[in-house]
Regions:
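N-terminal alpha-helical scaffolding segments that mark the starts
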Residues: 2-84
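Ankyrin repeat domain, specifically the short helix-to-loop turn at the C-terminus of the second helix
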Residues: 121-129, 159-172, 197-214, 230-238, ...
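Ankyrin-repeat boundary/"N-cap" motif
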Residues: 132-145, 172-183, 209-223, 234-251, ...
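Alpha-helical protein-protein interaction/assembly modules
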Residues: 146, 300-303, 307-309, 313-316, ...
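Ankyrin-repeat intra-repeat helix-capping/turn positions
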Residues: 150-153, 191, 259, 292, ...
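Conserved ankyrin/ankyrin-like repeat signature
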Residues: 153, 157, 194-195, 262-263, ...
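Hydrophobic alpha-helical transmembrane segments corresponding to the first two to three helices
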Residues: 385, 391-587
Length: 589
């Protein structure tokens, strides 16, 4: 995240030079133009013959099939949008062009698509009314310009245009910056419920998706790529959803994010689905969590939006609130989902569903990294601490008393025993031998035995049994750590065996935990407890000690033993965190 870049398309830059676009002579981006002047005179004189004639003669040449529209393959539209991207993101047909923005002709190899072909594959084609080559600088039509200026004069002109050419209503912006934005989107942004109703009555598509660069989260803009397989844009799934106008792509989501309840209800009444998901998998309720619209959230939920849909990051509205640390929204959704058993005054007895809250998946029994509790505990914002109240803290206390407390004390007792055994092992170790003595004996005993053993394994020499017995006698006699004559040595050897078995069991338990949690989550858990990391390292080193013992590498073993002791003892800090009086000191250390 944070992977953002500035991407101002050439069309946006060209809007300043409106004289190059024929469309702007009829209606320009400032609300002027030939048709605007005619419409003003028509409204004043109540004579519409002049404006009607101008629409028929001046607008119709800009349309496909005199306003009847034409089906365009989505693959051609994707190429038209893709030519505005940087060269390394261009699709293969455009990479060979020196200047794709000027050389690419969208009308080359256009097939004649019948109604039957469109009905068989509606996602493969888009019906357009306004000629692609006669559009504005950012792919807009005359209808977009009328609605964009948000005046009663231009609204009347827009209605007049739709009276003659009704199929213009579903034309969208074609440039990458605003791709997919329809007049319905613009009207919602203008907060004009009356015009929204008119457009819906005129047949506006209430499921049109607006996924232009301008409406994309900031940290996803650099990852935008195109594909011939579909019309929408591919983006990286990892995002923080921060965007100036990231409002969920659909008109219904636009209305919800902008708090336009009347527009929302109008669109919903026409059959719009509030559970439709945008490129990030977000529904209306996800978007309301992002923008913390509590009142609108209640309204959307009451009229049918679902709380159980997961987005691309596998987050429901509740878990999304937990991840983004939207404290008010989180507790609000929790209260919506709870089941109240009884209520007396300010006292309430309620049950909370745990399927999205608890770290244990209710279906698989595995750890859910996308649970609300896990997202809050591993959250990086200060606001995540505010979420550890009420239900979550009660859940943690219940889990502690039911499942963890006994195991924690048992682990503490077992580790204490392990540590005491390690003290016995390393306290009873004999001191170092006289300088030079051990090195001489090793060279005179181990070397020949090893060489003869290697030859024996190749079938060239048979080593007598008495020779091996002699090697063992030499090893036990010359290596101080293999001498079992005294009772202290026998106790030490027995304790070392116990310690080795204990280390093996600890390593095995860690491997089982990693298998259950998954490597990523296991490493995340270890990163929060450095003392446990040190202890596991000491266990691994303990498993290596027998090899050094058999080779009589006493100096190396002594060094390793010191490291083992130094990395074992700090594990007590983990268990000390149980007591509140020393917990702060433990965390500081």
């Amino acid at each position: 995240m944070g992977n953002t870049e500035s991407n101002v398309t050439s069309g946006v830059k060209k809007q300043a030079g409106t004289s190059e676009q024929k469309l702007y002579k009829l209606v320009d981006i400032k609300g002027g133009g030939l048709l605007v002047d005619m419409m003003k005179r028509a409204l004043q004189n109540k004579q519409y013959a002049e404006i009607d004639h101008a629409i028929k003669t001046k607008v119709e040449p800009f349309l496909y099939n005199k306003g009847k529209g034409r089906y365009i393959p989505v693959s051609h539209l994707v190429l038209l949008r893709n030519k505005e991207r940087s060269r390394h993101k261009l699709l293969p047909p455009l990479r060979g062009m020196e200047n794709p923005d000027e050389e690419f002709d969208v009308e080359i190899d256009w097939p004649q698509v019948t109604q039957e072909e469109y009905d068989a594959n509606p996602l493969g084609y888009r019906e357009l009314c306004w000629d692609l080559k006669e559009r504005g600088a950012v792919g807009e039509t005359i209808l977009h310009l009328c609605i964009l200026n948000a005046s009663s004069l231009l609204a009347n002109l827009a209605k007049r245009l739709l009276r003659f050419y009704p199929k213009m209503i579903n034309d969208v912006y074609m440039s990458d910056e605003y791709y997919g934005e329809s007049v319905l989107h613009i009207t919602i942004v203008n907060e004009d419920p009356t015009m929204v109703k008119f457009l819906l009555d005129a047949g506006a598509d209430y499921h049109e998706r607006c996924y232009g660069n301008f409406m994309c989260p900031e940290d996803q803009k650099a990852s935008r790529t195109d594909s011939f397989d579909h019309e929408w844009v591919n983006v990286q799934p990892d995002t923080n959803y921060n965007g100036y106008v990231y409002w969920g792509e659909y008109p219904l989501s636009f209305a919800a994010c902008l708090g336009q309840e009347e527009c929302y209800r109008l669109i919903l009444a026409r059959g719009a689905d509030p559970d439709k998901q945008d490129t990030n998998g977000n529904t209306v309720l996800h978007m309301l969590v992002i923008y913390e619209k509590v009142g609108t959230f209640d309204m959307a939920y009451e009229v049918g939006a679902s709380l159980n849909i997961r987005n691309v990051q596998n987050l429901t509205p509740l878990t999304l609130a937990a991840k983004l640390a939207r404290t008010e929204m989180f507790f609000h959704i929790v209260n919506i989902e709870r089941e109240i058993y009884w209520q007396i005054g300010a006292t309430t007895c309620a049950a909370y569903p745990l399927d999205q809250v608890d770290t244990i998946d209710t279906e698989t029994g595995l750890i859910s990294k996308d649970s609300a509790l896990n997202l809050v505990v591993f959250g990086e914002k200060d606001e995540h601490l505010d979420l550890l109240e009420g239900m979550l803290i009660d859940l943690l206390k219940t889990k502690w008393n039911t499942f963890v407390k006994f195991r924690f004390y048992r682990q503490f007792i077992l580790f204490t025993c392990y540590f005491l055994v390690s003290l016995v092992c390393f306290t009873l170790r004999p001191g170092p031998p006289e300088r030079g003595l051990n090195a001489t004996t090793i060279n005179s005993t181990m070397g020949p035995i090893v060489n003869e053993t290697e030859l024996a394994s190749e079938g060239e020499l048979e080593v007598p049994v008495n020779k091996m017995e002699g090697w063992w006698e030499d090893l036990t006699g010359e290596c101080r750590l293999m001498n079992f004559d005294s009772w202290q040595a026998k106790v030490r050897i027995f304790a070392e065996l116990l310690l080795w078995v204990g280390a093996l069991m600890y390593v095995g338990a860690a491997l089982r935990e990693a298998r259950f949690l998954g490597i990523k989550m296991f490493i995340e858990n270890l990163s929060t407890v450095p003392s446990r990391v040190m202890f596991l390292i000491s266990c691994l080193l303990m498993l290596v000690l027998p090899t050094l013992r058999l080779w009589c590498a006493e100096e190396e073993e002594d060094h390793l033993a010191v490291i083992i002791m130094l990395t074992t003892a700090p594990y007590f800090l983990f268990f000390c965190s149980l007591w509140k009086t020393i917990n702060c000191l433990t965390i500081t250390l």
